[in-house]
Structure formats: C-alpha cells, structure tokens
C-alpha cells in the first residue's frame, strides 16, 4: 500500500494554471499533488556568445527552491554565493529537455529563459518543472507569434513531459511523493516527447540493483504516465 493510498499506476492530481505571472511572456503554475512549481518563460533579445551570428537561438533554464518549500527552512543559494551540484544538474536537465523539442534555427537569434521556482516540494520537483516549463515555453512562443516574430508550429516540434517512477515496498510505482522517494529501493526519472521519443532517463538503485525486467516495468509506467501528462498539456493550452 502506498502512503497516499494511490494505486501503483496512479499519478497525483496534476494541474496547470497558465498566465500566473502578468510580467512574463509565458508562465504556468504546475501542481503535481503537493509539489507546486512556478515556471516562467522570458524572451531575451540575445544569445550565448558561442551562438552569435549563427542564426540560431537558445533555450535555457534555471531552477531554485524557496526557503520554506520544504519541511525545514533551507538557506537561499544566493546567500552562499554558489549553486549546489543538485541545482545545476536539475536546471541543465530542464534546459536539455526543452531544447529537444525546439527548432533553434526557427527561433532565430534570441534566447528564451525558463525559471522554475519550487514553491512547495513533495517529491518530483524536476519532473513537474519540465512538464510545466513546456507550457510556459509554449505560451511565450504564442506571445511571439502574436507579434509576428515567429510561427509556433515551426519552432515547437513536439510536447515534452517528465515523470518519476520507482520501486517502493517491492512494487513498481509512478509519480513518487517525498515519503516514497525517501524510502524507495529504486528511483528513476523519465523525460519523453509527445510522440514517445526518449529524451533522458535517470535511474538509481538505492539498495539492491534493479533487474532489466523491473526497468522495463518502470519504463512502461512512465510511457503511460507521460502520455497522460501530454494529454493534460493539450487540454491546458486549448483552454
């Protein structure tokens, strides 16, 4: 039995609130159960130095947690003067995931920066960030299209979403919350496109190694879950 009472293949309640920020070109408050992340997309008329005069744009991401996003206050990384390795890893993952579905040449020589700020954490912050950031990116591109800067369907090639899966209490489960994640025997994150392409898989055995059969079971759970997330994204942007 999962602590939340969910079935092994049941995700938490997922919701997207678009246009959460009045200033950003695109924004979305994404909720995976009690994990809440504010994702904003900002258009910048510049590119990294290595892309200047190439005709290509760039999509990048930053990730952070508010001090009381967790049970005990965590120190702001800005006050320590450096980002943790975990923060750097997660924001690079978010950026890679979004670039996988963007035509950087069609974007042109400009940059879109995604900021993913965790308001409340209960497991799965990176997967929620990726899934919500896609909506913020989409809405930023729609903002650009409304000003005749780009065509969305030329820049945004597909959906992208992410979900965690793991082995908890000897059972493969999807969308782990904090209680499950902290006690999981195996923990994995899957990032996939709307057409089923695999962008990234991160998997770790916390205790005994997991078998190929167990991995394929987790992959199957992730494929089903991400298909559901993509459907929810489609519903959100159609509203």
UniProtKB/Swiss-Prot annotation:
Q: Name one GO molecular function term.
A: tRNA nucleotidyltransferase activity
EC numbers: 2.7.7.56
Q: What class of enzyme is it?
A: transferase
Q: Which residues bind phosphate?
A: 86, 124-126
What the entry lists under PROSITE patterns is as follows: RIBONUCLEASE_PH
Q: Which InterPro entries match?
A: ExoRNase_PH_dom1 (IPR001247), ExoRNase_PH_dom2 (IPR015847), ExoRNase_PH_dom2_sf (IPR036345), PNPase/RNase_PH_dom_sf (IPR027408), Ribosomal_Su5_D2-typ_SF (IPR020568), RNase_PH (IPR050080), RNase_PH_bac-type (IPR002381), RNase_PH_CS (IPR018336)
What are the record keywords, sorted?
A: Nucleotidyltransferase, RNA-binding, rRNA processing, Transferase, tRNA processing, tRNA-binding
Instruction: Please give the superkingdom of this protein's source.
Output: Bacteria
Its recorded reaction(s) are: tRNA(n+1) + phosphate = tRNA(n) + a ribonucleoside 5'-diphosphate
Choose any GO biological process term that the UniProt entry carries and state it: tRNA processing
Q: Where is the signal peptide?
A: none
HAMAP family for the chain: RNase_PH
Quote the function comment for this protein.
Phosphorolytic 3'-5' exoribonuclease that plays an important role in tRNA 3'-end maturation. Removes nucleotide residues following the 3'-CCA terminus of tRNAs; can also add nucleotides to the ends of RNA molecules by using nucleoside diphosphates as substrates, but this may not be physiologically important. Probably plays a role in initiation of 16S rRNA degradation (leading to ribosome degradation) during starvation.
What does the record note on quaternary structure? Homohexameric ring arranged as a trimer of dimers.
Family from the record: Belongs to the RNase PH family.
Can you say what this protein is called?
A: Ribonuclease PH
- What is the species of this protein? Allorhizobium ampelinum (strain ATCC BAA-846 / DSM 112012 / S4) (Agrobacterium vitis (strain S4))
High-level lineage: Bacteria, Pseudomonadati, Pseudomonadota, Alphaproteobacteria, Hyphomicrobiales
Q: Which gene encodes it?
A: rph
């Amino acid at each position: 039995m999962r602590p939340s009472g969910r079935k092994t293949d049941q995700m938490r309640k997922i919701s997207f609130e678009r246009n959460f920020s009045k200033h950003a070109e695109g924004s979305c408050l994404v909720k995976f159960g009690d994990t809440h992340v504010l994702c904003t997309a900002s258009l910048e008329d510049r590119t990294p130095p290595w892309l200047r005069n190439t005709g290509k744009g760039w999509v990048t991401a930053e990730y952070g947690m508010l001090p009381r996003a967790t049970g005990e206050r965590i120190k702001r990384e800005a006050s320590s003067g450096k980002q943790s390795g975990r923060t750097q890893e997660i924001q690079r993952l978010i950026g890679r995931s979004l670039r996988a579905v963007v035509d950087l040449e069609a974007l042109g020589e400009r940059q879109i920066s995604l900021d993913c700020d965790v308001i409340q954490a209960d497991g799965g912050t990176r997967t929620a960030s990726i899934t919500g950031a896609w909506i913020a990116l989409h809405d930023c591109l729609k903002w650009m299209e409304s000003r005749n800067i780009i065509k969305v369907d030329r820049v945004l090639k597909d959906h992208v979403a992410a979900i965690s899966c793991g082995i908890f209490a000897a059972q493969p489960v999807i969308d782990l919350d904090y209680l499950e994640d902290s006690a999981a025997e195996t923990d994995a994150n899957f990032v996939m496109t709307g057409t089923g392409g695999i962008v990234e898989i991160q998997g770790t055995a916390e205790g005994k190694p997991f078998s190929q059969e167990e991995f394929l079971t987790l992959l199957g759970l992730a494929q089903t879950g991400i298909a559901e997330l993509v459907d929810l994204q489609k519903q959100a942007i159609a509203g």
